[in-house]
Amino acid sequence: MIHQLLAEFMGTALMIIFGVGVHCSEVLKGTKYRGSGHIFAITTWGFGITIALFIFGNVCINPAMVLAQCILGNLSWSLFIPYSVAEVLGGVVGAVIVWIMYADHFAASADEISPITIRNLFSTAPAVRNLPRNFFVEFFDTFIFISGILAISEVKTPGIVPIGVGLLVWAIGMGLGGPTGFAMNLARDMGPRIAHAILPIKNKADSDWQYGIIVPGIAPFVGAACAALFMHGFFGIG
């Protein structure tokens, strides 16, 4: 149990180090890859998740996936809260590590980059704030994401799951990520959002808890539950 919780914690932290790190690299003043664009960022998210899965193996690194596995009977319901907490804490620690790595660039950017942009390096935000529509986007993105992972996991070729999940993240990010930034994962959003709230970042905005709780906080669980029920009912996966 402890070993698996640590794997969830470290796997999520590594995912966030890649993901939040690429946003900092792309946005902050003085980095070598500033202005590289969304393809650069989305590709790094996909590859970063692939590497995390290769290193830590059979991990969820996403409370929405934990919920899906509990619904399908692959995990005990008693593990839902411990796994989810470990993943969120991993998200916090991963974001703190990125902040330490980019501390000089945060300092250089304090008077140039808006507080909202700084917040958005850590957590997701909608392009157009419309909470019902934002909720639907995150619900649907997560439904596709969890359904895709469950389908990929049925293929028993060694190494296919990490690669397939990375490609799935890339496709969702490119095709469906524009409205909300495709969190699909409470730990991906809430962990870095907590880090943003507690870190001594100069001239920072509030952490927008309303959006964080309603959209990336709740919608991924609804999408994951529907995905688990759909994949079990339609394809017999479970």
UniProtKB/Swiss-Prot annotation:
GO terms for molecular function: glycerol channel activity. Its main location: membrane. Transporter that facilitates the transmembrane diffusion of water, dihydroxyacetone, glycerol, urea, H(2)O(2) and D/L-lactic acid. Is involved in the cellular racemization of lactate and lactate metabolism, but has likely a more general physiological role. The transported molecule is indeed lactic acid and not the lactate anion, in agreement with the assumption that, with very few exceptions, MIPs (major intrinsic proteins) only facilitate the transport of uncharged solutes. PANTHER family: AQUAPORIN OR AQUAGLYCEROPORIN RELATED, AQUAPORIN-9. It is a multi-pass membrane protein. The chain crosses the membrane at residues 2-22, 39-59, 80-100, 135-155, 158-178, 211-231. Keywords: Cell membrane, Membrane, Transmembrane, Transmembrane helix, Transport. A motif (NPA 2) lies at residues 185-187. It is found in: Cell membrane. GO terms for cellular component: plasma membrane. It holds the Pfam family MIP. This is Glycerol uptake facilitator protein 4. It comes from the Bacteria. InterPro entries: Aquaporin-like (IPR023271), MIP (IPR000425), MIP/AQP_LacticAcid_Trans (IPR053481), MIP/Aquaporin (IPR050363). Belongs to the MIP/aquaporin (TC 1.A.8) family. A motif (NPA 1) lies at residues 62-64. The gene is glpF4. Disruption phenotype: Cells lacking this gene show a decreased lactate transport ability.
